[in-house]
Amino acid sequence: MLQVYNTLTREKEIFKPVKEGEISIYACGPTVYNMPHIGNYRTFLMTDNVLRALEYLGYRVKLVMNITDIDDKTIRDSKAAGMTLKDFTDKYTAEFFKGLDMLNIKRAFAYPRATENVDGMIELARKLIEKGLAYEKDGSVYYRISGFPEYGKLSRLNFDNILIGASVDVDEYDKDNPRDFALLKASTPEEIERGIYYDSPWGKIRPGWHIECSVMAMNSFGPTLDIHTGGVDLIFPHHENEIAQSEGATGKPFVCTWIHGEHLIVEGEKMSKSKRNVFTLPEIVEKYGGEVVRFMFLSVHYRKKLDYSEAFAENAKNNYLRLKETLDNLEFSLKGADDKSYPGDLETLKALPELETQFRHALEDDFNTPRALTVFRELSRTANLYLEAGKNRKVLEKVHTLYRKFSDVLGLFAQAGKEEIPEEVFRLVEEREAARKKKDWGTSDTLREKIRTLGYIIQDKKEGPNVKKAEES
C-alpha cells in the first residue's frame, strides 16, 4: 500500500489518485537563466524517482514539467548578457536537458514554456478580477490575498500577519511579509523596447512567476491534479500562491498531494557564491560520472538534507561500483552458464521473491530510495554468493532479471550491457580459466596479455573472472 508524505497535511497518507490507476504529476522545472546547480538537479531527480517508482508499482503516470522562460531573473540576466530573451533562455534550456541526460532522468510527457501560455494567464487574471480576488493597479494585476481565507494553508502562514491592501512586485519575498502579489506586471519602457510584452485588457504586460505554473498545470490536467513536486524553497511564496490562484478561480482543490525535496548543502553550509561552494552538475559529473551522482542522490531520502562533500561522493562511488561489478559478473557468467544443478540453486531462487517484496515495500513507504538501495545491496550479496560456485542458467537468468529490474527502477546502469564482450575475448577468458584450474600460470599470463591487447582487462575474483574494457578500470 503506497503511502506518501503530503506537505499540505504534514502527514504520511495512503495515496489514492483522482482517477484509479492513473496519476497526474506537475513538476516545477527550471528557471532558465543560468547553469542549474546540483541542488536543482536533486529536486529534478526526486521527481524522476517518484515517476519511476509509480510506474514500477503499476500506475500509468503522466508527468508535465514547466520551463520558466520569462520572469524577473531571465529578463534581468538576458539584458546583462546582451541577448534577446528567447536566445538567452533557449541556451539555458538546452543546458538543462543535457543535465537530465547526464543523470539518466526520464523525459516528461511535456515541457510547456511560460511564454507559450500567456493567453491563459491573461484569462485566469480576468476570471480572478471577476470574482473579486484580483485588481488592477498602475497597469499591473494583483491577487487580493485577503479574499482567499485559506491563504497560507500550505506554508502554515499566520493569516493575521497579512498586510491588507499592500502589494509586492518582485517574484520572491519573505514569508513574514505576505502581500498581494503580482499576477501580471506592467511592462517597463525598457522591456517594451526589448519586445518583452503582451497586449492585455490592462495594457502591455508580462506574466508574474506564480501565475505561470497555475495555468500550465491546469492546462495540462484540469482543475485538480494528483501530485505537485518541487523544492522546499518553493513552498512559500510560489506554491502557496499557486493554490490561491487556482482554487480561487475554480473553487476546487488544486493539488491532492504536495511533495517537496529538501535542500542540498555543502559540508554543512548552504550553497552561496560568496562561499564559493556552488557546484554545477557538469562539474560534479566530470569528476564522478553521472550515475555516481544519481546514486549519491538516491542514498539520502528526499525529505532529508543531503550534505555534499568529497568524502560522501567517494563513498557513493565505491558503493555504486560494487553494485556495477556484480552486474558485470552476472552478465559474464551467463555466457558460460549450463543446465547442471548446484548446491545454492534452491536457496538463491527462494531468496528472490522476498527481496522484491522488500524492495517494493521500500518504495511504497514514501519513495524510500535509501532503503531500496539496501535491498539492492542484499541482492548483490546473494548474487555474489551464488556466483562463487553456481552457474545454472535458469538461476542466473532469474537473478539477472531481478537485478536489472531494481537497477531500471532506480535509473542505474543504463549503459551496462549495451556493448557486448566480443566472442574472441570471451573464448580467451574461458581458455585462461581452464589453464588456471590446471595451475598453468604461464599460459594464464599469456592469455591475460592477449586479452589486454584486445582492449580488455581481467580481474580474478572468488566468484569468477570479471572482464572490463580497459578504460573502465
From Swiss-Prot:
A GO CC term assigned to this protein in UniProt: cytoplasm
Motif 'KMSKS' region, residue range(s) on this chain: 270-274
Cofactors demanded by this protein: Zn(2+)
SMART domains: DALR_2
Motif ('HIGH' region): 30-40
Binding site for ATP: K273
GO BP field: cysteinyl-tRNA aminoacylation
Key word Ribosomal protein present: no
Main location, first listed in the record: cytoplasm
The entry's keywords: Aminoacyl-tRNA synthetase, ATP-binding, Cytoplasm, Ligase, Metal-binding, Nucleotide-binding, Protein biosynthesis, Zinc
EC number per UniProt: 6.1.1.16
Coiled-coil parts of chain: none
Cofactor: record remark: Binds 1 zinc ion per subunit.
Localization: Cytoplasm
Tagged with keyword DNA repair: no
Record-given protein name: Cysteine--tRNA ligase
Species for this entry: Methanosarcina acetivorans (strain ATCC 35395 / DSM 2834 / JCM 12185 / C2A)
UniProt lineage: Archaea, Methanobacteriati, Methanobacteriota, Stenosarchaea group, Methanomicrobia
Originating gene: cysS
